[in-house]
Regions:
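Short amphipathic alpha-helix segments
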Residues: 101-113
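Extended, H/D-rich, highly charged conserved domains that either
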Residues: 28-39, 52-54
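Short edge beta-strands and adjacent turn/loop segments
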Residues: 1, 111-137
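Aromatic/basic-lined ligand-recognition segments
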Residues: 46-95, 101
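A short amphipathic beta-strand at an alpha->beta junction
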Residues: 33-47, 159-182
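Acidic/histidine-rich, surface-exposed loop or edge segments in extracytoplasmic proteins
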Residues: 1-10, 77-89, 129-136
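Short, non-transmembrane amphipathic alpha-helical segments
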Residues: 8-34, 143-165
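C-terminal region signature
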Residues: 180-195
Length: 195
């Protein structure tokens, strides 16, 4: 409720200020008797903009050993969520973006009433770890949902990378309609149609 204010903060400033605040948090937590002799882990998380489809990402973390009032060395995390399709992807996202665009194009060819196919990729150490796809639909009957789900399963197997975990959620105004889940190098995905 009320106004929301946000401004972009570059990673360097976020890390510098986050490390200062983390140290203050450790000092405050250690004042509590029940937290004097336990390890405490603190992570720095970068929140994406309010209108972003993807969540934020952890940038780094550090541990305060039991009984210590300071943090150990910070460990960098090279993790990032990205959304697909991208209009001008960086090199590390290009292959998945191309595959995703082919996947989306196949859906658009046969189901032109689908307005959006939204993908979220999770990258770690600049390598994709998983792909989640959300497809809101406006079909009216169970038979249409079953047919669309079967079609999607085939398109997923032919257009998306085989060595990648992929989860496709089909939703409507009524909630979840179907789920397709494929683990790396599986020939047959798990398919569930909600009743």
């Amino acid at each position: 409720y009320g106004e929301f204010y946000e401004r972009p903060i570059d990673d360097e400033e976020l890390i510098r200020e986050g490390e200062k605040i983390a140290q203050q948090i450790i000092e405050r937590l250690r004042m509590r008797p029940e937290l004097e002799d336990v390890p405490i882990l603190i992570g720095l998380f970068k929140q994406e903009a309010r209108n972003s489809i993807v969540p934020g990402s952890y940038l780094q973390y550090a541990v305060s050993s039991p009984g210590k009032n300071s943090l150990g060395d910070w460990v960098q995390l090279k993790e990032k969520y990205v959304s697909f399709p991208m209009s001008s992807p960086e090199d590390i996202y290009r292959d998945i973006n191309d595959a995703f665009n082919k996947f989306k194009h196949e859906i658009d060819l046969y189901f032109s009433n689908i307005t959006s196919v939204i993908g979220t990729g999770f990258y770690k150490e600049n390598r994709i770890q998983k792909l989640e796809v959300e497809i809101p639909i406006q079909f009216f009957g169970t038979a249409e949902i079953i047919g669309f789900t079967q079609y999607l399963t085939g398109v997923m197997l032919s257009k998306l990378p085989q060595d990648l975990p992929v989860v496709i959620s089909i939703t409507s105004m009524n909630g979840p309609e179907a789920l397709i889940k494929k683990m790396p190098n599986e020939d047959e995905p798990f398919v569930h149609i909600y009743e």
